[in-house]
Regions:
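Sec-dependent bacterial lipoprotein signal peptides
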Residues: 1-8
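Extracytoplasmic copper-binding redox domains, predominantly the cupredoxin/blue-copper superfamily
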Residues: 9-106
């Protein structure tokens, strides 16, 4: 499931106690964070920068096809639900030096 919204959010947080756990992550100062979540968690990225970014699975310049957000303007969000165990590298198509990993465990 992929959802793009125009809502802002606060600091990064985890709500894994519910049936639909959510992990929030802010894109700020041209930096992505490494993220660890459980299977079934939805990660919600919020762009806090005044420049557009994407969150795109893969390693620059290759898109792996797992997820690829549209260009996110300031305060826009992108969500992706992780349904499989693994390590998923991701990057920004606008700024390929921005890279990080989502680690998904049982």
């Amino acid at each position: 499931m992929v959802v793009v919204t125009l809502l802002g959010c606060g600091n990064a947080s985890v709500n894994e106690g519910s049936q639909n756990p959510v992990r929030e992550s802010e894109i700020i100062d041209f930096v992505f964070e490494d993220i660890s979540v459980s299977v079934g968690t939805t990660v919600v990225w919020t762009n806090m920068d005044n420049k557009a970014h994407t969150t795109t699975s893969g390693v620059p310049p290759d898109v792996s096809g797992v997820w690829d957000s549209p260009f996110l303007k300031q305060s826009q969000t992108f969500s992706y639900r992780f349904t499989e165990v693994g390590e998923f590298e991701y990057w920004c198509r606008v700024h390929p030096f921005m890279t990080a990993t989502v680690k998904v465990e049982n």
